[in-house]
């Protein structure tokens, strides 16, 4: 096509025409070669996953192999030339742009194809700044309204607020674009004018609701919906002052997920194969067929490129927000899908970007098996950047019928320590997986012509991703971060030229690219965290990098609030580590365990040496730097301000560190205890906000320590909460809460002691599991002998934990009570005599504990408190007299005898699998249970109050529902349990899974819900069902590991089913912490139900009813393996008792459930007699509800005490319980035993199993 224009020099017209043709040829060539590469990738996906193969958590090995083939492809190696050519054409276009603008309108439309196709090229390859430059040039030539909308979105995304203000004044929009303009204006005013934030927040919320309710289905409306949701996701990233204190912000997680969902819908309707929700691998993901028919349509190139880029950025941000908010399962799921989509797009930058994100996340997570994922991703990063990539020859982990050996690693345990731990070798977990030896990292050189060295100087965001890969490869060493810090300025300068072209003003010095800021911030946070974990001091290089990082992440504060807060707090901890160096907190020296065959007690003792005997470090390195008290007080004030202004947002990296740091350094016990509570359950509370789609101060957080104090003081006197928490420096702390006194806070143990505890404990569990699953050719007598040896070692190990891990602080786990007037007066005297050694709350606690502790232990515990501070030496000489006086005044107080008191443990994920309920101090004490979190406890108590229910809860065992062996592979268990179930009027299913609506109805309408099968029943009761249910029934999940919490990393809640039930407001959850044999757990359940519900049916009066915790305690004592079985079963929630019901009746045998054949897979729902109508909980007329104290009402020590077994409910606490990921289920081995049986024989019968394990029987040939 020949173009002439009188107003422009002919030579320039010819150059523009030639450039137009060259750009078209280059972009089409790029699209064709990319399409060839996409076809290769598509064939690899079909080979690895099949046409419709699932993408799940075990897909990383396959994705790593596909990535290595991608990096080795000839088509991939030729992509760099297009980057070089496009860069030259971009420069040429900028020299001719002025002439193109002066052409006639018709000619300008023709020349608009130049920036349009370059815009597509740069969007597709993730070079956003140049893409936006070309987009703005295209708008100047064509005046496309939809392109203007795209430009506004991208300018806001990149943080170019000054340029947005100019464009809003100069651009004219159609009526159809009014909402896009309005959303941008509202967001701009919200960012720049804090006094208008309330008004702008309301306007944005109204616009969001308007867009959501709009039924129009068009590309522009979906783009608007995604954009508005993304804007809303950032609105909570502001400090909450007086004006915003009561505002409801949009929740970040739910809104960024909505933005990603809308962007995915846009891609699915344009290029279906690139949609994250498209799992048909045969669907075309190639871009060329969609461009081939629109080669002359400049508008199409712009919008297809913008749509794909926006989709990638929304998906990436969604994954990062999930990490920030501790949504572990959603994080990994989103990242795996992102890598899959990136590979299908064949975009080098996107593949590297998603691989880096996965590698970064894998380096954070510390659960068993995560080291494999981390290494796979590091290998993939190096392979992508290598000039000579190697095919990853690794296979997917083998599927076996064996029980999953879920371990409980401690946070921060590195791969290098594996040989000194009791975890299985990596090869045991991965089958035939063979990992590559890592290659050396490919350096950038001018002489090299590979893809990496060619693209690095041309693409600033790619350069930042390259530096991130280097940091990941170097395990975030100081050398790699220093290199990144030095290189960042050069990367910024290269990218700044494009940003200046956006403004068309050479005097403008724009801020760094948001993507580069985020990447650098992420790397610095990981590096600082590792420095703190390794106790490294801060040198000059460290402080230089820290200060530079703080400056960089502050360029776009509302987008990087989480990073600003995290980097700031990590810097404070570098400056003031505030380590615990008390006498009982010495780190232990780790030694390799002895590998021994367990044939006798001596063997198990050799394999698991007594806890607490490891040598301890005698001298700790002291910080020689003088302590600046004045500076620290400023730091303390700054932290309080942050807690106050940003307390409404729950960002993991910041919150788990700042609040725990305040908890261990604050001198105010109420502030410290409040901070400890707020440092936990971050992911679960974010999940609650996500479901509610709003974020508000006080919604899932407590607004301050005054509010926390009110909640604690409103607790029943009979209830004590004990939190065992892991601090930011990984030390273990105990926090004790009771309504009558200030919180008690005691550092318990060094991190190395906690590692030793869980290391040895996990080994004992694994050893028992191996005996049960793989007994070999041994007699039944020998089988039980070996298991009893392990059980005996577990018993002594638990004793050792109390003695050496808790020490004298073990008594603090016992419940507290209200002091009488004389005892309270004595506590005040002791507090004053200590001269600062004992706080008043601690003095009250010690007076109360005097009757429960011997004099020596009592004095030792007081001296622990005094060591934490300073005290008068004479005070020690008064301790024997103080103990005698305390015992005397407590003997005058009959509260210990007349009231049953309850201890509820809130345990951090890393120590939650340990059987705390079986500590010797609880041997004669059945009233101990667990709570999911302090927040959930307050929420449960408030729910009881609002529903006018009495504590303990009264349960009608006849009004129950059961699911028995839904997988239909536990035939003997079915026979045993069906016979027992026939005694009751229960409804349920045997050998098949009920429908979701039946499960929801059962949880809502029944008093009790029983699951007897594998794990927690996630296969038949998925999270989606529990999310939509209101659980009024107590839930007994009698599967192995049903309530186990698998820890992941500091600040994460861990994987567990209990959070799903807690989210559904389940009042009580009973389940197993580890694998237990079938016969044993069946007998345990039968004994517990009989003892709590059946055996008490003839009693009258609520005080005479047997509590479930008492029945559980009794069942533990009767278990054949009192620790391996008895200690496995625990309860989360409030106490329950049996409701008075009519005696059991004989039922028509025709209506009883029958055991189905094990091989049958059809529905086995059985007809039952009509169930007892559900009876609502009512307040007993004979025992009135305890009045609730108001905020300003003081409690008198002499007020009337409540009757035994009746807890008073608290005042309203506006908190909600949380949700998190399901723990992986574990198969079990079940023991066959008749329903009514004589004493357990010494020789077991043949056993069925949930896996391939079988207990030896007498019929076996030995």
From Swiss-Prot:
Q: Where is this region: Disordered?
A: 1147-1262
Give the GO cellular component terms, alphabetically: cell cortex; centrosome; chromosome; cleavage furrow; condensed nuclear chromosome; cortical granule; cytoplasm; meiotic spindle
InterPro entries linked to this entry: Peptidase_C50, SEPARIN_core_dom
Instruction: Give residue spans, biased composition: Low complexity.
Output: 1243-1262
* Enzyme class of the recorded protein, top EC level: hydrolase
Consequence of substituting residue 450 to Y: In e2406; temperature sensitive mutant which at the restrictive temperature of 25 degrees Celsius displays slow chromosome segregation and lacks cytokinesis in the one-cell stage embryo and during meiosis I
- Phenotype upon gene inactivation: RNAi-mediated knockdown causes embryonic lethality where embryos are arrested at the onset of meiotic anaphase I. During the first meiotic cell division, homologous chromosome segregation and formation of polar bodies are impaired, and multiple centrosomes accumulate resulting from a failure to undergo cytokinesis. During meiotic anaphase I, impaired cortical granules exocytosis resulting in the formation of a one-layered eggshell instead of the normal three-layered eggshell.
Keyword tags:
Cell cycle, Cell division, Chromosome, Chromosome partition, Cytoplasm, Cytoskeleton, Hydrolase, Meiosis, Mitosis, Protease, Thiol protease
Q: In which tissues is it expressed?
A: Expressed in oocytes. Expressed in male germline. Expressed in spermatocytes but undetectable in spermatids (at protein level).
Q: Where is the active site?
A: 1040
This molecule's function is given as: Cysteine protease, which plays a central role in homologous chromosome separation during meiosis I and in sister chromatid separation during embryonic mitosis. Promotes chromosome/sister chromatid segregation by cleaving the scc-1 (mitosis) and rec-8 (meiosis) subunits of the cohesin complex at the onset of anaphase. May cleave histone H3-like protein cpar-1 during meiosis I metaphase-anaphase transition. Promotes cortical granule exocytosis after oocyte fertilization during the first meiotic anaphase.
The name this protein goes by in its record = Separin homolog sep-1
